[in-house]
Each structure stands twice: as C-alpha cells, then as structure tokens.
C-alpha cells in the first residue's frame, strides 16, 4: 500500500474513534453521592380515628344522641341522668363511645342510643376537626366540650390536657402551627389559687386524631 494512503487511513480511523468516544454519554459519577427521597423525621402524624380500635366493656348507659356541631362527623349524646358529652363515635347502630382517648385505649362513656342514630356523614378533609392530641412530651389533650369556657389572657381554651389546669388556647385551626412538618402548639397552665396562667410553653405535636 502507498505509505501516504496508509497514513491517511490511520488518521481517518483515529478520527472515527475519537468521534465515537466523544459521543458516548459520561457514566454517572459514583462519587457524587446522589441521594433519593429523604424521610422527614419528627413530622406530626395525622390519624383518622377508628372507634373499633378501642375495646369496650361493661353495660352502656341509655341516652339520646344527635349530630355534633363541635366535631363534624360525630355525635353529641346525653346519657340519662348525666351531662351532655361529645364527641361520640358510633360502633354500628347500637353503641357509641364518647370522649375516647386513643393513646390510652379507653373512653369516658359508653352509650346505648334510645332511638335510631341520625345519619352522620364523614366530614370532608377541610371540615375535619382535631379532637385529640399527643404532644412530644407524652402529654395528651382533648377538645373541650364543657359549657363553661376557660378564658385565659391569650384567648379561650379549646383543649384540656391530662395535667390538671393545663390547656391549649384556640380551636382546631388556631391552636396549632402547622407551617412545618412537625406542628407546634403552646401549653398554658393555670394557677388554681389565683386563676392566672403562667407564660405559655412551646411544645411539639407528635400525633393528632380526626374523625
């Protein structure tokens, strides 16, 4: 073969190889440490309450029940000889558990309705009201249904906590700051001697329950 032609052929082969190499996509950089979706830790858990998750025992009290205006999707019941109580959750059409504590797995009152229960449709997500709260400390608080309001300097207590004289101020939309994955709230404890409240203490919210 003519040396010039041989040289040209070699040059063409080298050019072709260079073109192939430059057109091959770069392999992923294994040292870049690419990371997939991250798990958000400590985010507040919103739980749809299942009344069948709580075991019931004993004889129910007879009472009359109507739809609750405090917690849509639940009932308000009046036991015979007792005080009105809510929220109450139907177990079929024959019994209701009132003021359940999902953390402890118990309830305040078991009701047997004296008349057929009114139809109570489940609330839409924008009308779902938080009725029970567990804070990061383990303290639990339930929505207040008592007729007598508890008024503090910062507002009316919307939730009453397991520790005596301890409250969360505001309703389901104002008592909690849900602007971050972990919600926060403020705890107020009254001095039973003076009726005054100590400065509010910020607290993280671990779990909340809705109907």
Regions found by a protein language model. Name each.
Residues 1, 25-28:
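Intrinsic-disorder/low-complexity regions
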Residues 1-10:
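Bacterial N-terminal signal peptides that target proteins for export
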């Amino acid at each position: 073969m003519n040396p010039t032609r041989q040289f040209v052929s070699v040059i063409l082969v080298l050019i072709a190889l260079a073109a192939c190499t430059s057109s091959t996509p770069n392999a992923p950089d294994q040292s870049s440490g690419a990371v997939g979706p991250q798990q958000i830790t400590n985010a507040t858990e919103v739980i749809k309450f299942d009344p069948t998750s709580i075991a019931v025992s004993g004889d129910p009290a007879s009472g009359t029940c109507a739809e609750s205006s405090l917690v849509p999707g639940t009932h308000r019941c009046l036991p015979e000889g007792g005080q009105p109580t809510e929220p109450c959750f139907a177990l079929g059409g024959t019994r209701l558990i009132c003021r359940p504590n999902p953390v402890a797995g118990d309830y305040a009152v078991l009701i047997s309705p004296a008349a057929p229960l009114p139809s109570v449709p489940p609330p839409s997500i924008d009308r779902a009201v938080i009725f029970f709260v567990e804070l990061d400390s383990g303290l639990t608080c339930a929505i207040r249904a008592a007729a007598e309001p508890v008024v503090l300097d910062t507002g009316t207590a919307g939730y009453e906590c397991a520790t005596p004289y301890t409250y969360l101020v505001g309703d389901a939309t104002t008592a909690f700051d849900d602007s971050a994955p972990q919600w926060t709230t403020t705890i107020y404890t009254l001095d039973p001697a003076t009726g005054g409240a100590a400065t509010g203490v910020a607290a993280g919210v671990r779990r909340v329950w809705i109907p």
